[in-house]
């Protein structure tokens, strides 16, 4: 008669397999970024000679020993004395990466602040107020989430052109002032806030705006941080719309500036990778600072409202 497996052993096996799968997934996700960082520290000749290695030759012990003994090595040409951060410095001095980074920061920051304000007010109206056609309007709002961004590109450009905002700061940020996903996310979160708090505030003489500012928003910090992070990331990574609406290089964000940088540098990949690493640092910093709110905001917003 076959005895059942030990439950503790089964639990350990499941945990082991889960660890292995997650470790493989982590390697798949981290490897491209590690490759980009390693390539950004190489010279142009080093990258052309060895595109596969993650570690530049100057950091490899074997190549260092060969160079010290006078043997033929990858450090025999300009690699030994090449400053480690030269690609980063050249990107700022010659490639205007600092200007592109500042533009991206301004665009993403302004869009995030305005979209949080507009979406929070709209979500509060859908979640806490009752008016005629509320369900129909909300359904139409959700339907806009099914439209591909490419479909809206021409109508948005026509509107921006009619307003005379082509090739300007406001022309870039105007289409991002509101979003259906943000309204939906915040509405779901607002509907989970106990209604007794709002009723008690109204008994004390608070109006709708005061309730929104002093009760709803403070209790919705996880959802607001989550939406702010998603909005900032979308604005930071935006490429097609700035490319369409801008022609002055002084207004270029980093995403568009990188394509220009590639043409000017003659496909100097180490320098391009260095600019890409600099462009990724703000998003990484934001995720590290807001990660404890991220999962909570999404999970609580997805709960069924009572």
Task: Describe the function of each predicted region.
Residues 2-306:
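A structural signal for multi-pass alpha-helical bundles of membrane permease subunits
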């Amino acid at each position: 008669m076959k005895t059942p497996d030990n439950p503790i052993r089964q639990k350990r096996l499941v945990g082991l397999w889960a660890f292995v799968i997650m470790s493989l997934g982590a390697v798949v996700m981290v490897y491209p970024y590690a490759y980009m960082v390693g390539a950004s520290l190489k010279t142009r000749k080093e990258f052309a000679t060895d595109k596969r290695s993650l570690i530049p030759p100057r950091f490899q012990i074997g190549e260092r020993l060969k160079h010290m003994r006078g043997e033929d090595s990858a450090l025999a040409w300009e690699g030994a004395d090449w400053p480690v951060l030269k690609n980063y410095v050249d990107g700022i001095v010659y490639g205007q990466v600092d200007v592109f980074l500042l533009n991206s920061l301004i665009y993403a920051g302004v869009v995030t602040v305005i979209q949080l304000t507009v979406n929070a007010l709209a979500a509060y109206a859908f979640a806490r107020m009752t008016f005629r056609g509320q369900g129909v309007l909300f359904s139409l709002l959700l339907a806009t989430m099914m439209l591909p961004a490419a479909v809206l590109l021409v109508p948005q450009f026509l509107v921006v052109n009619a307003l005379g905002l082509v090739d300007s700061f406001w022309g870039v940020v105007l289409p991002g002032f509101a979003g259906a996903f943000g309204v939906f996310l915040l509405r779901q979160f607002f509907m989970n806030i106990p209604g007794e708090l709002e009723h008690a505030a109204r008994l004390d003489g608070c109006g709708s705006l005061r309730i929104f500012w002093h009760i709803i928003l403070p209790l919705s910090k996880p959802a607001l941080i989550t939406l702010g992070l998603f909005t900032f990331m979308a604005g930071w990574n935006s490429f097609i719309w700035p490319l369409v609406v801008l022609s002055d290089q002084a207004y270029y964000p980093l995403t568009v500036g990188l394509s220009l940088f590639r043409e000017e540098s003659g496909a100097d990949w180490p320098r391009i990778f260095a600019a890409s690493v600099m462009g990724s640092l703000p998003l990484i910093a934001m995720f590290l600072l807001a990660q404890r709110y991220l999962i909570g905001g999404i999970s609580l917003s997805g709960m069924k409202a009572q």
